[in-house]
Structure formats: C-alpha cells, structure tokens
Amino acid sequence: MALLSIVSLQVPKSCGLKSLISSSNVQKALCISTAVPTLRMRRRQKALVINMKLTTVSHRDDNGGGVLQRRIADHHPNLWEDDFIQSLSSPYGGSSYSERAVTVVEEVKEMFNSIPNNRELFGSQNDLLTRLWMVDSIERLGIDRHFQNEIRVALDYVYSYWKEKEGIGCGRDSTFPDLNSTALALRTLRLHGYNVSSDVLEYFKDQKGHFACPAILTEGQITRSVLNLYRASLVAFPGEKVMEEAEIFSASYLKEVLQKIPVSSFSREIEYVLEYGWHTNLPRLEARNYIDVYGQDSYESSNEMPYVNTQKLLKLAKLEFNIFHSLQQKELQYISRWWKDSCSSHLTFTRHRHVEYYTMASCISMEPKHSAFRLGFVKTCHLLTVLDDMYDTFGTLDELQLFTTAFKRWDLSETKCLPEYMKAVYMDLYQCLNELAQEAEKTQGRDTLNYIRNAYESHFDSFMHEAKWISSGYLPTFEEYLKNGKVSSGSRTATLQPILTLDVPLPNYILQEIDYPSRFNDLASSLLRLRGDTRCYKADRARGEEASAISCYMKDHPGSTEEDALNHINVMISDAIRELNWELLRPDSKSPISSKKHAFDITRAFHHLYKYRDGYTVASSETKNLVMKTVLEPVAL
C-alpha cells in the first residue's frame, strides 16, 4: 500500500491498539483464543438429557404369529400441540400493514435513486461504499425481494470501478483503495455472480505479509473493516489461500475485540456473525437479529452515509417481518392439521418434528409466493424422518424388504402384504408424492413423479444397505460407508421435490447441475452425512447403529482415536464447503444462482440444526428458541 501511512493489523492487547495479527503467528493466536470462550458469546443451553440407549419392545406380528423384538429409540415427543398451534393469531395480516409496507418500499427505492452517480460532481468520495452498504443492509434485514432491480443497478455501478489488483475505495474518486469497501464488495459481488478474485486482498498486506490498514482510521472503523473481511472470507473458493488466511486472522481478531469492548449493538452483531457465519446462517434468523442492532452503530449512523435513512429501512424490515409472521402462522396451522390427520401421526417409534421443519423452511424462503415450497419441504422431511426411524430401528429386515419392494411397484394393492404400521407410512408417502408432483407440474409444466420416485428408490436401497449392516454387525470401510451414506442422508430427496414447486423453471440442463449425479448434489449430500455423523454418532451407537463416518475411519486407520477421525472429517467438511460455494457461485455456470439458491439454502438449514448437536432429535433447546424467535414471536413495531 504505497504512499499511505499504514499500521500492521495484529490481535489487540488492549482497547487502545490499532493493529491485528501477523500471518506467521495467526495459527498460534487462533489456538489460544479459541481455547477460551469469549466473554459475551451467548451461552449454549444445557443439552436435554435423553436416554438414547436402545429399548427393545415385544410386538406380536399382524398375522397372529410369534412375538417380534423391535428396537425403539427414546425420542422426546412433539413439543407443539395442535390445540396450541390452532390458537395462534396475528393482526399483521390486515391490509393496513401491507399498504404501509408498499408505501415504505417506494420510499426506499427513492433512497436508492438519491445516491450520487458518476454524472454528478458531488458525492464521489462515498458513492461506492454507500451502494454496497445499502445492498448489504437490505439483504441482512430480509427485505431484498422488493429491490432486485435496484440491487443489480447498484452492483453494476460498483463493479464498473472494481480493480482486480486493488479493489475499490469508498468512492469513485477515492485516492486509495479501502479494506472495508473492498471486503464488502468482494463478498457482495461474488454472492451475486460477478467475477471477482480474492487476490485483491493481497493488496492489503504490508511487506511482511501482515494485513494492514491506514493509521488514520478509528478503532471502530478498523473493527468494521475486519468484520467485513471475515464475512468475505467465508465465501471462499477452493485453493484461495488468502481467504483462508483472512478467515483465521479476522476470526481471532474479532474474538479478542469482543473481550475488550463494552456490550453494544455492534458487539452483538459481531457475536452473531462469528456464531453463524455463512454456512449455518438462516436469512430469517439473521433478519430477526439484525433488526435488533441495525442503525445503532455510531460509525454507520454518522454523516458518512447522508443518503441513507436507516430508520426507514428498519421500519420496512419490521413491517415485512410481522406480515410474513402472520402468513407463517396460517401455514403452520395447516401443517399441524395435516400432521394430525396423517396416517403416521400416531406412530410412537418416530420423531414428530413438523413444526421444526416448517421453521427451517420459512427461515430460508421468506417470499409469500413460495408457500408450496415451504409446505412441501415440511411434508417431505416429516415422512423422511418416519422412514429413517423405521429403517434404522423399528422395522425388521424382512418387513423392510417388503416395504422397499412395494414402493418400487407403486401400487396401493401392494400394501396388503405390509404390517399395519407400514401401511400407514406407505399411504402417507403415496399421497404426499402424488400431491407434490401435481404442485410441481403447475410450475415446471411437466410430470416429475417418475423422476422423484427414482430418487426415493435409490434412497430406500441405501436404507436397506444400512439395515443389513445393523442386522449383521458389519462395519464397512470409510469409502463404502460414505458412498452409501451420501444417499441415505436424504439430502437429495429432501431437496428435489420441494424445489420443483418453486416458480423458478428447472429444465433438465439446470437439474443436471443440482441433482444427482452432479457435483453440487454430491457435495451437499456429503456435507449432510459428515456433519450429521459428527453430531449423532454416539447416540446412534447407543441405539445399535455402529457404522458412522467416525467408526469407519477408525477401522481403516488402526490406532487412530475418535479425535483423529473428527479432525479428518472436519477438514473434509471445510473443503467441501468451499467447493459447494464454487458450485453455487461459479461465474461460468450455465444456470443462474437463483435456480440453485434454494437447494443451497436447504443445505445451510441442515447445517444450522447440526451446529452444536442433532437439533432435530433433541429439539427442546436451541431449536425451540429458533421456533419462538422466527415463527411464533413478532417484533415490536
């Protein structure tokens, strides 16, 4: 950074320092800082203690024959009674609120138009950062669906000033590039499909390879720059070493900052970003948290953003949050009735998590018109959970083979050979797949039922492999386990039919980039299997399911420990995340990002629930709080 007085950025030893961390010491510093929790990181609630050991129950078979020994896991029951769900009400579905929102949307569009452009002499010192900050704020507040055209125009403007080796400054006439503006631009432009290289971050290192910034910046401005550097680093592609360095460095720096600065809206924003990052972040949860802190940071509220009315953006965000909250309650009431009336609702061997699945769906898809996607996702995931518990624990090997064969024949008359509990599961599955295929035909213009059935057949075959492993006590190799586990994870079946109900056309050439055997599908399935195993392997083992990525790795590597296996798998997960970023955002893709975004967000939703434990099986702590915060509770207007 020639011709500019700079300071190397090192982890602050006290509040007064303006520097961060050297590349040579960053690994050591990170190990130190991550060993001790930061002072105000939100405490994890104590896990609900559940007896996950196998319970064996005796059942007489339906033909009056001998007594069958069945395996049942001790899952906690549904936490949300239908009577409670049906009692929910919200005033925010009224026309007065939607009319107010329409008015504010137009006012925000005018705000976009008021930002100076290159045809005006004034405003040239901050026009780039203002546009980026507007786009970033709107997206984090969950109101970006109203401003897609304005966002594209703003980012085209920013990109026109992007320099591959230097990035950008705050404005088009800025003398020097700026780390905050460049990091925010790198992240935002990349997420919108622009071809930007992370090599630009090398410009912001000194001669010793340390990240650096101008000495004239305040501590708050430096911290904001590092926060956006961290956010940018999370959308890394494979092989981007500078992004890895930026992530390690910025995470360490921000954790140290949190131990020094007082509690504020800015500190809470940092905490949220560090906790959820990008791959476990849910858009609606982010909007809920950002509403609480938005516009209170003195740096962002200063005169450096004279064309931005933060209170107007906040007003719209609150209105939109509550209007959608009203729709959520109606959809949730429908789902609760559907579950209560379903054939499988009375089954006691399985987890009933329809409310939790709805929460996931509505946290990643907030457009009112995507109701079919949300409802289809819930129904699909509920049935996949029932099937998972049936194949893993309750069903006998002979029964499971009968069910698999009956499904492949796709004929209701085949249910006569099934035990009663399987008839209930088969009926629900048959009705749901036909119903969702009809929904998909409305948007895709073609019958997708056979396509979906093929995906389920592969899924059930993988279930059968695992059931046979459990029955025989066989422990496969890691490669054999993962090949089958990608399919049995359910990532493909949980994703495929819901995304076909969206209003986004998915012709075959796009499906080939999302569905099996695409690299996108392979990565998403691997991530769900590996992350799920790291959170569930002990409980699964207690239920008699010995095969997991951890146990299979240890078998392949005699003398290795569980810690060795977990370290290896976590590296695989990190690498796969960067690859999945590339598959979503690659500039040379034939299909638009929008066509793959919901599939990508489903992966993020699963990762969120597996962040600390199996948040589906044990849904009484973090998951329950998520339901309350994003579905049941409105924000104060």
From Swiss-Prot:
| UniProt-listed GO biological process terms | diterpenoid biosynthetic process
EC number in record: 4.2.3.119, 4.2.3.16
Q: Name one GO cellular component term.
A: chloroplast
One annotated GO molecular function is: (4S)-limonene synthase activity
Q: Which reaction does it catalyse?
A: (2E)-geranyl diphosphate = (4S)-limonene + diphosphate; (2E)-geranyl diphosphate = (1S,5S)-alpha-pinene + diphosphate
Which residues does the record give as Mg(2+) 1 binding sites? D388, D392
Task: Give the UniProt keywords, A-Z.
Answer: Chloroplast, Lyase, Magnesium, Manganese, Metal-binding, Multifunctional enzyme, Plastid, Transit peptide
Chain positions recorded as Mg(2+) 2 binding sites: D388, D392
Q: How is the cofactor bound?
A: Binds 3 Mg(2+) or Mn(2+) ions per subunit.
Q: Where is this motif: DDXXD motif?
A: 388-392
The domain comment in this protein's record states:
The C-terminal part of the protein seems to be involved in the cyclization step(s) required for the synthesis of pinene. The Asp-Asp-Xaa-Xaa-Asp/Glu (DDXXD/E) motif is important for the catalytic activity, presumably through binding to Mg(2+).
Function statement: Involved in defensive oleoresin formation in conifers in response to insect attack or other injury. Involved in monoterpene (C10) olefins biosynthesis.
Additional comment: The conserved 70-Arg-Arg-71 motif may play a role in the isomerization step of the terpenoid cyclization reaction sequence.
Recorded protein name is: Limonene/alpha-pinene synthase, chloroplastic
Q: Which organism is it from?
A: Abies grandis
Q: Which gene encodes it?
A: ag11
